[in-house]
A protein has these predicted regions:
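A glycine-rich helix->loop->beta "capping" turn
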Residues: 11-12, 69-72, 92-105, 110-112
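C-terminal helical subdomain
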Residues: 207, 223-272
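A short, exposed helix-loop element centered on a Lys and neighboring polar residues
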Residues: 149-150, 192
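Active-site loop of short-chain dehydrogenase/reductase
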Residues: 13-14, 71-72, 99-100, 155-169, ...
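The beta1-alpha1 cofactor-binding region of Rossmann-like NAD(H)/NADP(H)-dependent oxidoreductases
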Residues: 56-57, 77-90, 131
Length: 272
């Protein structure tokens, strides 16, 4: 990955890091940023050398999709439960790019049992669900987002008009949701705390709330879900790319933004 468009003398591309981007929403966001001309680092555990489960998608494929869309992609295998590995990615981005315009906190744990076919288990009351579900959602979800933000904050502060997007969900606002709702509420709070602390540095921080998204994992259980108003991973990506390109994004800092609201704000289709 270079910082200049080859042979054009064009200004350096804007730089993003999308965590948990081998598939699903993360890959959709990375691809949309590529289509907008960004340089995008994608991280996840699944790689050509070995997948974490049966679902398709690797960091190499996601990076190639970024480049095919018109951006510059770099895939890095990273276990986001490993703080040293996360910090190493941040150091690499600083060394290669010298800037970070956008951090997308998307990596997520806790679906491993669902992806293994245990959909009904996810509907059980919290006292009947395995404790490992809670641990995974907070370790490879909330804590992973906290760590990525912590190691990237100095780079974000030194990059003008940078942005942090934490992918969350409206279930945090109330209703049933068990460990998932608790984790998403914590993510919303992380986005708000970052907004309050980073605003003086002109860094925006928001939570983004997709609806039902037709990811590889969700489509395994399409028979159980009403997907008539669902979004595509690429559609969510277009919403995030539009947000990242908004010169007035700092006015939105601290908010939890529904993808449908972003679609209306920017006049984009998030369903296809």
């Amino acid at each position: 990955m270079t910082t200049m468009a080859e042979g054009t003398g064009a200004p350096a591309r804007r730089v993003a890091w999308v965590t948990g981007a081998s598939r699903g929403v993360g890959r959709g966001i990375a691809s949309a940023l590529g289509a907008a001309g960004w340089a995008v680092y994608v991280t996840a555990r699944s790689s050509a050398a070995g997948r974490t489960g049966h679902l398709p998608g690797t960091v190499e494929e996601a990076a190639a999709a970024v480049s095919a869309a018109g951006g510059q992609g770099a895939g890095i295998v990273c276990d986001h439960a490993d703080d040293a590995a996360v910090a190493a990615v941040a150091r690499r981005i600083r060394a290669e790019q010298g800037r970070l315009d956008l951090l997308v906190n998307n990596v997520w744990g806790g679906y491993e049992r669902i992806n293994a076919g245990l959909w009904e288990e996810s509907r059980l009351p919290l006292w009947e669900q395995p404790l490992e579900v809670f641990d995974a959602m907070f370790t490879r979800g909330v804590r992973a987002h906290y760590v990525a933000l912590a190691v990237c904050a100095p780079m974000l502060i030194s990059t003008p008009a940078s942005l942090v997007v934490t992918v969350s969900n409206a279930v945090s606002a109330g209703g049933d949701g068990g460990a998932y709702a608790m984790a998403k509420l914590a993510d919303d709070r992380l986005a708000l705390t970052a907004a309050l602390q980073l605003k003086e540095h002109k860094v925006a921080s928001v939570a983004v709330h997709p609806g039902w998204v037709r990811t590889e994992g969700v489509m395994q259980f399409a028979e159980y879900i009403d997907l008539s108003q669902s979004q595509s991973p690429e559609g969510v990506g277009r919403a995030v790319a539009a947000l990242a390109g908004d010169p007035d994004v700092l006015s939105l800092t601290g908010q939890a933004l529904a993808v449908d609201a972003l679609a209306a704000r920017y006049g984009i289709d998030v369903t296809t």
